[in-house]
């Protein structure tokens, strides 16, 4: 019993030391609805960063581009290449959507590692990257689903739904299930990676000297960028598939 009691106390001490909170939310009461205040706060901060950066970089275009202008032109070219590769020749109208997804997710992911969210104290929970909340990633995934349904229907009309019985009607349940698994995989992949990255960094910072977690933080930044690329690339691929003659 003494060994068990000692083990329990040790585990409790480690938990208290880490100070990690998962599932704690700060809500705003708006009418009859509860709104995740922390997600709205961090999302608007990310949006403000994106709008501010874009305004500063392109408000006075130069014949010889500045560093900021060069950076934004490179990002735009990169997003266009991703869209064209995945969607095909009709990629043009979808560049803003794919670009918005990529930039919002990229900056959101990096904000979790670079911005000192914990300085702002909330009555419940704590501020973190918007993509650290499952509601944000599900919303992004549902937007992607709506986009590829719209792309398919606008290209093929109601004939788009004939894909569910191709190549044989026996596959109808599987083809329907696929449309549910796409947003689920998108949302949970992004949410799980960002949440795990932030938890690892928080625990390491709490348990070991501050210089030790730095390599993990750099790895987290790299992973965050990759996750933004994966999400936007898959979104473009799904849109491209919905516009093809076969799926």
Curated annotation (Swiss-Prot):
<keyword id="KW-0406">Ion transport</keyword>
<feature type="transmembrane region" description="Helical">
    <location>
        <begin position="33"/>
        <end position="53"/>
    </location>
</feature>
<dbReference type="InterPro" id="IPR023011">
    <property type="entry name" value="ATP_synth_F0_asu_AS"/>
</dbReference>
<keyword id="KW-0934">Plastid</keyword>
<feature type="transmembrane region" description="Helical">
    <location>
        <begin position="199"/>
        <end position="219"/>
    </location>
</feature>
<feature type="transmembrane region" description="Helical">
    <location>
        <begin position="95"/>
        <end position="115"/>
    </location>
</feature>
<keyword id="KW-1133">Transmembrane helix</keyword>
<dbReference type="GO" id="GO:0015078">
    <property type="term" value="F:proton transmembrane transporter activity"/>
</dbReference>
<dbReference type="Pfam" id="PF00119">
    <property type="entry name" value="ATP-synt_A"/>
</dbReference>
<comment type="subunit">
    <text>F-type ATPases have 2 components, CF(1) - the catalytic core - and CF(0) - the membrane proton channel. CF(1) has five subunits: alpha(3), beta(3), gamma(1), delta(1), epsilon(1). CF(0) has four main subunits: a, b, b' and c.</text>
</comment>
<dbReference type="InterPro" id="IPR035908">
    <property type="entry name" value="F0_ATP_A_sf"/>
</dbReference>
<feature type="transmembrane region" description="Helical">
    <location>
        <begin position="220"/>
        <end position="240"/>
    </location>
</feature>
<keyword id="KW-0472">Membrane</keyword>
<dbReference type="GO" id="GO:0042170">
    <property type="term" value="C:plastid membrane"/>
</dbReference>
<protein>
    <recommendedName>
        <fullName>ATP synthase subunit a, plastid</fullName>
    </recommendedName>
</protein>
<keyword id="KW-0813">Transport</keyword>
<dbReference type="InterPro" id="IPR045082">
    <property type="entry name" value="ATP_syn_F0_a_bact/chloroplast"/>
</dbReference>
<keyword id="KW-0375">Hydrogen ion transport</keyword>
<keyword id="KW-0066">ATP synthesis</keyword>
<comment type="function">
    <text>Key component of the proton channel; it plays a direct role in the translocation of protons across the membrane.</text>
</comment>
<comment type="similarity">
    <text>Belongs to the ATPase A chain family.</text>
</comment>
<feature type="transmembrane region" description="Helical">
    <location>
        <begin position="134"/>
        <end position="154"/>
    </location>
</feature>
<dbReference type="InterPro" id="IPR000568">
    <property type="entry name" value="ATP_synth_F0_asu"/>
</dbReference>
<dbReference type="GO" id="GO:0015986">
    <property type="term" value="P:proton motive force-driven ATP synthesis"/>
</dbReference>
<dbReference type="GO" id="GO:0045259">
    <property type="term" value="C:proton-transporting ATP synthase complex"/>
</dbReference>
<keyword id="KW-0812">Transmembrane</keyword>
<keyword id="KW-0138">CF(0)</keyword>
């Amino acid at each position: 019993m003494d060994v068990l009691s000692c083990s329990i106390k040790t585990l409790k001490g480690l938990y208290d030391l880490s100070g990690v909170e998962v599932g704690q939310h700060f809500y705003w009461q708006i009418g009859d609805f509860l709104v995740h205040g922390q997600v709205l706060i961090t999302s608007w901060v990310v949006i403000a960063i994106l709008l501010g950066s874009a305004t500063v970089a392109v408000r006075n275009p130069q014949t010889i581009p500045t560093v900021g202008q060069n950076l934004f032109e490179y990002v735009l070219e990169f997003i266009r290449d991703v869209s064209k590769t995945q969607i095909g020749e009709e990629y043009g109208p979808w560049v803003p959507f794919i670009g918005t997804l990529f930039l919002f997710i990229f900056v959101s992911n990096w904000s979790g590692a670079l911005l000192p969210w914990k300085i702002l104290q909330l009555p419940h929970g704590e501020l973190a990257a918007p993509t650290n909340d499952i509601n944000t990633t599900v919303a992004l995934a549902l937007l992607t689903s709506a986009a590829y349904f719209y792309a398919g229907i606008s290209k093929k009309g109601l004939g788009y739904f004939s894909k569910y019985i191709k190549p044989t009607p026996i596959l109808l349940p599987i083809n329907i299930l696929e449309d549910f698994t796409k947003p689920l995989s998108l949302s949970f992949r992004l949410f799980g990676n960002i949440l795990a990255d932030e938890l690892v960094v928080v625990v390491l910072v709490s348990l070991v000297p501050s210089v030790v977690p730095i390599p993990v933080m750099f790895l987290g930044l790299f992973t965050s960028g990759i996750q933004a690329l994966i999400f936007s690339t898959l979104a473009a691929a799904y849109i491209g598939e919905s516009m093809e003659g076969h799926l």
